[in-house]
Amino acid sequence: MIIKPKVRGFICTTTHPVGCEANVRRQIAYTQEQGMIANGPKRVLVIGASTGYGLASRIATAFGSGAATIGVFFEKAGSETKTATAGWYNSAAFDKAAKEAGLYAKSVNGDAFSNECRAKVIELIKADLGQIDLVVYSLASPVRKMPETGEVVRSALKPIGETYTTTAIDTNKDQIITATVEPANEEEIQNTITVMGGQDWELWMAALRDAGVLADGAKSVAYSYIGTDLTWPIYWHGTLGRAKEDLDRAATAIRGDLAAKGGTAHVAVLKSVVTQASSAIPVMPLYISMAFKIMKEKGIHEGCMEQVYRMMRTRLYGEELALDEQARIRMDDWELREDVQQTCRDLWPSITTENLSELTDYTGYKQEFLRLFGFGLAEVDYEADVNPDVKFDVVEL
């Protein structure tokens, strides 16, 4: 079939298999151009490995460090008449490229919050790799099915304490609007911590430890975002921030646990990027459009791949971790530069529907957004007939 983008809200309901593969190939090429990561990991588990920072982590370790990788994700396959999710095509493309390069790659498609998924991954590690030396935790899910009770808990992207009103972009109409978000109640706050906090990361690390599949000196990293005063009301001071604080709590606990065998665990705070997750957060598309323009002008713009590769090479496996006072690895250092932030603050009040594309990189934002789904890549022929049913070596749970 010939596949065209269909955008609804913050999701594109169609995806392009050839475009997604081209995207993955671009990220692999970038990694290979940068060269190998000295003393990098060799056996890696990525939990949340199919898009965004998780996919970039899998690429960085496999193609930048020659690592064998196991990727866990929850994606939908395509059929002859329906496209798969982008993460399915990304993972298929990664699998193909890894095998071409002679690298071990196994993928598990299932609910990463489930005990069944943990058991399957441990079985794979024992059978194929023995142990692992890096665990990347990069899950972005709005819901979590509790492993013991089966209860489904939903997160809420809301401010805490007071109603938040701000300028935002209606990405469907490309218009500047006033967005109002009501504050969360206590239950919504707790639910968001349950879904997006550090508890599941702890469960994974405990299961891996108890099974004896963590190598001596194993490292673990979980991804977070803090942002700036421009986004704090909806993010860091909101329900998401509470969940991310819980991630910090979990990191401290896991770090204490791994220390006995020379291992370590940290939260890595990353920059804002265009992902399916960030496009769902009010204000983020506008903030990202501004930050992108300024950072591109200053030559300090990074996407997921550049950011993760820099973290792996210069921090996690580099000279020094350069931690903040909460023992976090800060990769948002360039975005938080005062010159970048002040320009954003000055710009924010003056943005209108008319000057949106001129004052910000909203055009770039939209291009990046479509690229997540495999559209808008120059090297892809979008008039060609393609088969949406892409098969690859994946363990289905």
UniProtKB/Swiss-Prot annotation:
Active site, UniProt feature: 235
GO terms for biological process, alphabetical: fatty acid biosynthetic process
GO molecular function: enoyl-[acyl-carrier-protein] reductase (NADH) activity; NAD binding; trans-2-enoyl-CoA reductase (NADH) activity
Keyword annotations: Fatty acid biosynthesis, Fatty acid metabolism, Lipid biosynthesis, Lipid metabolism, NAD, Oxidoreductase
Record site feature (Plays an important role in discriminating NADH against NADPH), residues: 75
NAD found in the keyword field: yes
Entry binding sites for NAD(+): 48-53, 74-75, 111-112, 139-140, 244, 273-275
Catalytic activity as recorded in UniProt: a 2,3-saturated acyl-[ACP] + NAD(+) = a (2E)-enoyl-[ACP] + NADH + H(+)
Pathway: Lipid metabolism; fatty acid biosynthesis
Activity regulation (record text): Resistant to triclosan.
Residues that coordinate or bind substrate: 225
The keyword Lipid biosynthesis belongs to this UniProt entry's keyword annotation: yes
Superkingdom of the organism of origin: Bacteria
UniProt function note: Involved in the final reduction of the elongation cycle of fatty acid synthesis (FAS II). Catalyzes the NADH-dependent reduction of the carbon-carbon double bond in the enoyl moiety that is covalently linked to an acyl carrier protein (ACP).
Family assignment from sequence similarity: Belongs to the TER reductase family.
PANTHER family xrefs: ENOYL-[ACYL-CARRIER-PROTEIN] REDUCTASE [NADH] (PTHR37480:SF1)
Protein name: Enoyl-[acyl-carrier-protein] reductase [NADH] FabV
Gene source species: Aeromonas salmonicida (strain A449)
